[in-house]
Amino acid sequence: MALNLQDKQAIVAEVSEVAKG
């Protein structure tokens, strides 16, 4: 399972926003 750097960044950003609420 390989993710592109952009995809990884996007996922991290989404998770961060969700975590913040």
Swiss-Prot record:
Keywords, alphabetical: Ribonucleoprotein, Ribosomal protein, RNA-binding, rRNA-binding
Keyword Nuclease: no
The keyword Ribosomal protein is annotated on this UniProt entry: yes
Source domain of life: Bacteria
Transmembrane stretches, start-end: none
Gene Ontology CC terms: ribonucleoprotein complex; ribosome
Gene Ontology molecular function: rRNA binding
Assembly and oligomerization: Part of the ribosomal stalk of the 50S ribosomal subunit. The N-terminus interacts with L11 and the large rRNA to form the base of the stalk. The C-terminus forms an elongated spine to which L12 dimers bind in a sequential fashion forming a multimeric L10(L12)X complex.
Function: Forms part of the ribosomal stalk, playing a central role in the interaction of the ribosome with GTP-bound translation factors.
Record family assignment: Belongs to the universal ribosomal protein uL10 family.
Protein name as annotated: Large ribosomal subunit protein uL10
Native source organism of the sequence: Proteus vulgaris
Lineage, broadest ranks: Bacteria, Pseudomonadati, Pseudomonadota, Gammaproteobacteria, Enterobacterales
